[in-house]
Design a protein with these regions (language model features):
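Short helices/loops that flank or line small-molecule/ion binding pockets
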Residues: 50-61, 79, 137-138, 154-162, ...
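Paired acidic/hydrophobic, glycine-rich loop segments that form the ligand-binding mouth/hinge
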Residues: 63-66, 168, 257-261
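Hinge/lid segment of periplasmic solute-binding proteins
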Residues: 2-5, 70-129, 180
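Extracytoplasmic/periplasmic solute-binding protein
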Residues: 110-123, 129, 153-206
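Conserved N-terminal structural module of periplasmic/extracytoplasmic solute-binding proteins
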Residues: 1-81, 88-97, 141, 145
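Glycine-centered hinge/linker elements that transmit conformational signals in sensory
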Residues: 156-158, 202-238
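Extracytoplasmic/secreted proteins, especially bacterial periplasmic and envelope-associated proteins
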Residues: 20-27, 31, 47, 51, ...
Length: 261
């Protein structure tokens, strides 16, 4: 099927990707521009979460926005700041995405009238819940890969007892500083409670001051707020850019032994 002729038209896109991460996306955009004749303008920002709201409220939103967090898209959809996708996109997404209907559900939110509509589909999905380490460093120190949260805590304590630093953690991300901590907290929640508890938390049926949520936050704090557990001490966690945080794994000798993605 041939691409439509969009000569003379402009498509504006805003998203969180900056150089060099945006290079692959820009190559896809360039292919679309060549195929259709449209001019495509992409603007990246490390303050996307704030800027997209400001632009939408001012009536200056882009044609397309790349949301790192579906929750923000849901909030804006409920305020009437987003336009739903055509009805045909739901079946197309279910048919062409490996996870099928679940991807449709993740892009479906209530509009300002409370009606569920498809507002987005997933272009780029990041792998989470991985703990990175350098095998040679573990071998040299005599450490084994932990198989449970209890083993992970024990290994963390062992590394400290050996006079080393177990973790590199960085939460810095410009105006969005702090979001990597949400990955930790979400992961711990899913490892601590059944999926339905996580869903209640996401939909705000269970508030943030619920004892379960507080316990999960405190568990994360045991890693991030202990000066002996993190490279640079706990006060550095918020200022180290998340993109730079894994670098300590590769120093010789290593500045830390583990980094969570």
């Amino acid at each position: 099927e041939s691409a439509p002729d969009l000569s003379g038209q402009t498509v504006t896109i805003s998203g969180p990707w900056l150089q060099p991460e945006d290079e692959v996306f820009r190559s896809v955009v360039a292919y679309f521009a060549d195929a259709t004749g449209a001019e495509v303008i992409y603007t990246g920002s490390d303050s996307f979460e704030q800027q997209i709201v400001i632009d939408a409220e001012a009536g200056a939103a882009p044609n397309i926005a790349v949301f790192p967090q579906p929750g923000l898209a849901a909030d804006m959809a409920a305020r009437g700041l987003l336009y739903p996708l055509p009805d045909s996109m739901g079946p197309w997404t279910a048919e062409n995405y490996g996870a099928g209907e679940s991807w449709v559900d993740l892009g479906t939110y209530a509009d300002k009238d409370g009606n569920d509509q498809l507002f987005g589909f997933f272009y780029n999905v990041n792998v989470k819940s991985l703990v990175w380490y350098v095998p040679e460093n573990f071998e040299d120190a005599g450490y084994e890969v932990p198989g449970s949260m209890e083993d992970l805590r024990a290994l963390t304590e062992q590394i400290v007892a050996d006079g080393e630093v177990p973790w590199c953690i960085g939460l810095g991300s410009g105006a969005a500083t702090g979001w990597p901590a949400t990955d930790w907290v979400e992961d711990i929640m899913l490892r601590s409670y059944p999926p339905d508890v996580y869903d209640q938390w996401v939909t705000n049926e269970m508030p943030f001051n619920d004892p379960k949520v507080v316990a999960v936050l405190e568990t994360f704090g045991k890693f991030a707020k202990n000066d002996k557990f993190v490279e640079g001490g706990s006060k550095a966690v918020g200022s180290i850019d998340f993109r730079d945080s894994p670098k300590g794994l590769f120093d010789i000798p290593p500045k830390c032994y583990m980094h969570r993605q």
